[in-house]
Structure formats: structure tokens, C-alpha cells
Amino acid sequence: MTRSDWLKQALVIPLPDDPALVLDGCRRLLGPNLYGREPGAVGDALCEGALRDRVLQAWPDYLAQLLAGLEWDAAATVLRPFDGGVSLYLAAPIDRLFTGAYVIEAAWHLCACALLGRAAPDMPVLLADLRAIMAHEANPALRALADKAEARGLDRLLDDDWVTFGHGAGAVTWAIDDLPAQPDWTAVNDIPVALVTGTNGKTTTTRLIAAMGRAVGVISGLSSTEFVKVGDEVLEKGDYAGPAGARLLLRDPRLELAVLEVARGGILRRGLPVGHAQAAVVTNVASDHLGQYGINTVEDLAQVKLSVHRALRLGGQLVLNADDALVVAAAPLSMQPVWFSLDPANPLIVAARAAGRACGWYQGGSLMLSDGATEVALIAAADVPLSLGGAARYNIENALAAALAARALGLEDAPIRAVLASFRSDPADNPGRANAFSVNGARVFVDFAHNPHSIAAVTSALAALPAKRRFVLLSHAGDRSDEDIRGLVSGAFALRPDVVVVAENPKYLRGRSLGDVPALMRQRCLELGLRADQILAADRPAVGAEMILDLVQPGDLALLLVHDDRDQIFAMLGQRGTLG
């Protein structure tokens, strides 16, 4: 049994069973995180009203007692109240992360027992159990190596059984229980790394930056919601916008430049994967996947996204959307972000230019960049295929963010410009992002947009394109609220559709019954003004796509919002139409 296997089952603390006081889970944060730059552990408790006020006092008090009993000195803690509960974070050395999670859980047990008037475990016995775990987890060799790496300015990747210092072509990886006494540090180094997060646009921005790296002749790679890729090789397909994808990418010995798409879930579950990035981008923040880990509002979500700044190395650049009020409000006061905007009169852009700080903006049809000393017109939006002639303003934002991040990675303007001029919305360069096809003289677009904000952005851009008739395919997974599903339909109506096909998503019911989601979508279409005969039904997305392709005629426009059957739909379009 490995050390980590033993630690995962080392202690079972019988938590009080009462719906008024629920520990929603404890987890280890392996890198910089929402609460701080150091790794640690966090627990989320669900409690309401006056009981929550008592938890705010009692839980950290019991944690302090346990830490004192364990002679755990100078441990930073963060108490974060939220609507309906409390989160408690404990910073911990890298060889006390399991112990930290158990200590938080034990402190909760003592707290809940006291508040519920129940018998608590004997403190000396509980401390003895925790000391045994701490002794078993202790790894002085790991701590010593981590200190030496930090002194040399080297980054660290950590999981349950392995530790890596440096990145990619400069990385070394060892089993945590088999560490060298005197490693050769001469070949260990970090490589340029960028992090990209946000509610929408992060995948496109990630792909753009990686393409810019390839354009200068280095082996660049990315981890994303679609795959992990090094050069032209896809290492794994799937949602890898978390620490596991980052580790898979950054441990590849061929890698010379890395771009990590970073999702909300990965940040909250395990923290950020790196601590020495040269650039971090936040594209925007909108309501999405709220209600988990105590993140209940879009303001909370903005704080999660902005925590990427804690993964920056000294001198790294934080690239932020100056047009997003949530991003602006959450921006760390300790930093001078590199702002980008579609409006040259945005006060943050005006201030940055006046102060001689780097920034990017859109003016007179061109993407403008400043390094603080020189301002250049990088490229005209009309020459950026992703912008759809300037109609897709969200992709102008993504292009500005990518260009500024690429500059932060040390890339010159020529390859940045070349990628923006050649990178297309097609299944090769940017699969699932407004991919354009021609079928029977109609323009057909495929997009994987999955929330009201992203759907509204796509449909608003396509609404500017002329069309005789407009078709939309709608479907979605069942793990959205009724309000969210209605919002998805409302966002799609920016396209002013003449026909909507509502498709069931049988593999993604996620707690709902067959027909629930299509019924909600159909009702919202009726409320927004479509007649019943303008709303068609399909039992799968691929069937719905085929129905639309059978109906389109020259001059029509169709948007297929695809959640499932992606490969089948792309194959269908390849057989019945052409790219472009």
C-alpha cells in the first residue's frame, strides 16, 4: 500500500448526523488557490442563520486547539462565510496536506458536537490519532527538495504519489517515496507558461496562444476542456482543464511552451497546478455552475477566477478584461493588470496608456497594443477570420487577450499577427467554436456554447450576417436550473430564428426525466413569439441537425448548438457540405 493510499483511509471521524450542521467535504489544495498562494486544506460547512454565526466562532477555535495540541506552529487560516455556510482553510506544508484535511474535519466534529449538545470524542485520543497521521505523512526529503527548488526559482507540480520540479523539457519527476539525496539541478528549468480562465472564451484564447508558440518554432502544448496536446499529438481527449491535465502536459519532456486552460472546478477542488506562470488571463465572468463549494454568486465566481494571479511568478503579467465589471471589481489591488478593452475610451485603458503601462484595445477597426512605450496597430479585425469581419466582438476580445499573453511569454508581434490572420473557426483550428460550413447554399455554424452568456455572444454575432431564414438547434444537459435553461433559449433568440429544433439529450438527463428539458425550451420559444409549427422536436441532437440540413436552402443561415453527438454531426456536415 502506498503512503497516499494509507493516508486516504487513515482515520474515519463519525460526523454528527444533523441537517442543520453538515460538513459538505474537506479537500486538499495542492497549489495556489482561492484562499492564498500556499497549498493547504479546506472544508465547507452548510449551516444557516444564528447557527452559522456560532460556527464562525467555534470552528476556528477548535481548529486552533488542535493545532496547538499538534505543536503545528504559524499556520495561516482563512475563514470564509457564504450564504448558507462557512469555509475554513488551513495552509499546510506539502507533507501535511492529508493531515490538514483531517485536522479541519476533526475541528468540525468538535464544533458540531458542542453546538448540538452531543458527546465529543476524547481530545487526547483524537490528538494521538492525528499525530500518527502527521508522522506517517511526514516527508523531510520532499520538503528539503521543495525548498531547494524554490531557492533556485523552480516551479513544482504535486500529486498523491509524484513530484515534479521544472516544466516540460526542463522537468524532472520522482516518486514521493523515492527521492534523490543530491539531484543534479543543472538540467532543471521552467518553461514559459500561461494560464487562461473565464466563463467563456478561454478555450479559444488557449488555442490561440498555443498556436502563437508554434509559430515561433517551439514545441508548444495545451491542456483544455477538449484535450491535452503537445505539438501535433493529442495525448488524451476529454475535459482536462484541471490539475491532472496540467500535470500530464507539463511532464512531457518535449514541451517548450505551455498554455493551461483553467476551469472553476479544478481551482476549487485542488487549487492551481503551477506557481511560476508568466501570464494569466481572465476573459470574463458570468453566471455558470454556481452553488458548489460555497460559490453561490457571480461575485464569488469572479474571486475564484481571479485567483489565477496567485500562480504568477515574480514579474508575471495578469491580463484582464476591462469591459467586464465583475473582473474589474475582483482585480487584486496589489497588482497592475494588463487591461484589454473593445473601447479605447475605457477609463482603465486611458489610465494605462497615460501611465505608460502595457494594455490592448480595439480602435478604428484595428487591434491595438501598447507595451507602455510604443503603441502599434497589430492587425485589422477584418483580417482576423475569427472575428467574422468584426461581427464576432467576443473573438476580438479573445484575440486581444491572446496577443497580450503571448507578449508576456516573450513572443514577438510578427508571429502573433500571423496566427491571428490565419487561425480559423473550423474543426481543425478551433473545433466547436462557430465552425462554418456551406450546405445547399446555406451557411451552417456549429458551436459548443453551453451557457446563456456564450450563446448570446455567438447569436448576436451571427445575427449581423444576412439570411433569408434562420434556424437554430437547441439541446442541453439536465443539470441546469429551469431558469438557466430558459436563459439558454433567450440567448439563442438574439439570432431571430424562424425555425427552432428542440432536441432531447438522452445521455445527459442528469436527474431529469425524458422530455423535461425539451418541454422547457419549447415553452420558452412560444413565450418569445414563435408559433407552434415553427418549433420542431428531435430525439437526439444528431437527428435535429439532420432535420435542419434537410430544410435549409440557398441564402439561409443555421446555428447548431451542439452538446452531444459532436463527431456524428461533424461527419454529417463533411458529407453534405464544405467548410467555409
Where do the PLM segments sit?
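Short beta-strand segments
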Residues: 91, 195-197, 224, 261, ...
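Preference for protein termini
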Residues: 1-192, 216-219
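Residue-level signal for inorganic ion chemistry
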Residues: 149, 223, 261, 283, ...
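Flexible active-site lid/hinge loop adjacent to a nucleotide/diphosphate
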Residues: 230-339, 344-348
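ATP-dependent carboxylate-amine ligase
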Residues: 1-78, 84, 392, 404-414, ...
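Short polybasic amphipathic segments
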Residues: 162-166, 226-229, 365-372
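Walker A (P-loop) phosphate-binding motif
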Residues: 182-227
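Adenine nucleotide phosphate-binding catalytic loops in nucleotide-utilizing enzymes
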Residues: 295-302, 306, 335-456
